[in-house]
Amino acid sequence: MSIYSQLKQILIAKRCGAFALIDPDIKNDGALLETVEKINNSGFDAILVGGSLIQDNNFDTRIEYIKDNTNLPVIIFPGSSKQLSGKADAILFLSLLSGRNPQYLIGEHVESAPVIHSLNLEPIPTGYILLDGGNRSSVEIISNTIPLPMNKVDIILAHALAGQYLGNKFIFLECGSGASNHASATIIESLYSRLNIPIIVGGGITSSASAKLISNAGASFIVVGTHIENGASVEELQEITSSI
């Protein structure tokens, strides 16, 4: 069964799933095993691996290490076309719809597509929408794009619909790692009532209350990353995953 089919099965079994995000940078190597074990015991459905900037050439090695220490699907969440590995189970094939930088609308995709094909890596087309989470994110800086303001719900919806009509399998609302705010319930509800594809929401999710709010608004998957990296306990993470 494809990873995409497995994700759809998760949504049949329960209202909302949870992804754990691992930043596979050298600065996190010392805590990588502890992080993976924590994720394994916290009720997550899959692991996303990727970051805006990786400072060495060991992405493939870290993917293999994560795979060796978990039974969860490992999905690449790429910050660039260089973040590829045949050892992963799938890759979110991201188009940064909220920006107008052609490198992240099609450039990175053209560069990565032949490699993805040669690796026999399952691509999952995903429309990626960067929202203003209250502080300047690494995604904003690296991609040289401006996030959409959260009070412009109609503009966010238009981008999401465009992503759906282009054939994306998911819409990913992103406020950025360590965001002060997560995507609002108003935004999620607006998209949920009009889209026919699942919504992933990441950035600023640090409590069961925020996770439940996002889930109730219509998100299909939440993403927790910085909260894990900052030392959240298994019990705290279980509260989040069980609340949805």
What are these language model-derived features?
Residues 16-32, 78-80, 130-156, 201, ...:
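Active-site mouth loops of central-metabolism enzymes
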Residues 34-35, 76, 80-93, 190-224:
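Catalytic cores of alpha/beta
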Residues 1-22, 26, 112-125, 132:
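N-terminal amphipathic alpha-helix/helix-capping segment at the start of soluble metabolic enzymes
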Residues 141-188, 228-231, 236:
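Glycine/Thr-rich beta-alpha phosphate-binding loop at enzyme active sites
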Residues 49-54, 90, 94-105, 175-178, ...:
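Glycine-rich phosphate-binding active-site loops on the catalytic face of alpha/beta enzymes
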